[in-house]
Every structure is written in C-alpha cells, then in structure tokens.
Amino acid sequence: TETLYVFGAGTTPDILTRYYLHQKGLSYSLNYSFTTPGEISQGLLAGQIQTAVLAEPFLSVILRKDSTLSIKTSLNNPDSTSPGFAQTAIVYAPSLNDKRTLLDSLLNESCQFAVSQPQKAIDILESRNIFAPGTLTPESIERCRINYLSTGEAKESILDFLRLIEQYEPKAIGGKLPDNGFISGEQ
C-alpha cells in the first residue's frame, strides 16, 4: 500500500482526503508524522515523501522549486459528482447586521477581483506583507477556486460539509451537528 502524507489528523485536509479515498475506493496508508504543510513541502523537495496532500500556497511553491512534482488530483472538487465544500466563512458581530448588504457586496467584489485579476491581487497581498513575494502565482489563485456565496447561497454546502465532518471526525464539531440557529440571518 502506498503511503500518503497528510498534516493535521482531524483537520479539513485530512477529512477531505479520507472522503476522497473512500469515494474513489483507493487504499493508501495515511501518515501524519509531518505535522505542518511546511514540513510536508520540505519532505517532498528532499525526496523523503512521494505522495502528499498539500494546500496552497505551499503547493505552488514546491511546484516552482521542483518541476518533476505534479498534481494527482484536487480535493476542492475532484470530479463532476463531488459537491465541493464551503471552506471559509466570514463571521461578523451582530452590531454590523445593518451593514450586511454592503459587506456582502464588498466580499463578492473582492473575490471576483482576485479571480479576474489574480496578478493584481497577488501584488496587493505581497505589498501588504500578507504573503511573501513569490509565494503566490495566478495558478495558485485559480486552484483555490475562490467563489463568494452569501449565507443563503452557501447554507446547503455548509451543512453538507458539517455532515461530512460528523461522519469522519465528529469531535471536530463537538460530536453533533449544530442546531438550526447556527446559520442565521440568511439573505
């Protein structure tokens, strides 16, 4: 059995990896001995690791450093039957509820900007020291599959993802699905 290195047992990358392997009927021995994406990156570049799960921007960095490495599949939405999952949520204080429409609009515009003008987005992120120069590429932005959805639009995807977490790592959500009040203020 081939070994697949994954960082962070019980984290999103681990859960999505186990889900993907199960869906595809693949058998890998999962190894969690490298605890950060940086350690996995170093292991891949040093030839200590042959197959690993790695997120952006680490993926882009190692692909630039070693052209013999390649992507086997994407866990974001590996095929047309996979639903994809909401993986980031923007949470704000109740005092900002009256600004919800404005916030949704700004977030949507920001996501559209990153997708339509990735190099400009990268330049801004680097100029503000959010990412080190050379870490991101337009391809890394594309692989992130950035897409803004309002709470109402994302609700089913969020619930699907929570059900997936419950199936593979229930303690990550406190052992049970949240109640109906978890996703509030839909638009």
Task: Place the predicted regions along the sequence by residue.
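Secondary-structure end/capping motifs
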Residues: 95-168
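Residue-level detector of short coil/turn "hinge" positions at structural boundaries
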Residues: 28, 132-133, 172-173
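Surface-exposed patches in mature extracellular/periplasmic domains of secreted proteins
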Residues: 32, 121-125, 173-177
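Pocket-lining segment of extracytoplasmic ligand-binding domains
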Residues: 38-125
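Conserved C-terminal helix/tail region of periplasmic/extracytoplasmic solute-binding proteins
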Residues: 159, 163-187
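Short glycine-enriched loops at secondary-structure junctions
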Residues: 8-11, 75-78, 129
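Bilobed "Venus flytrap"/periplasmic-binding protein-like clamshell domains
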Residues: 1-61, 119
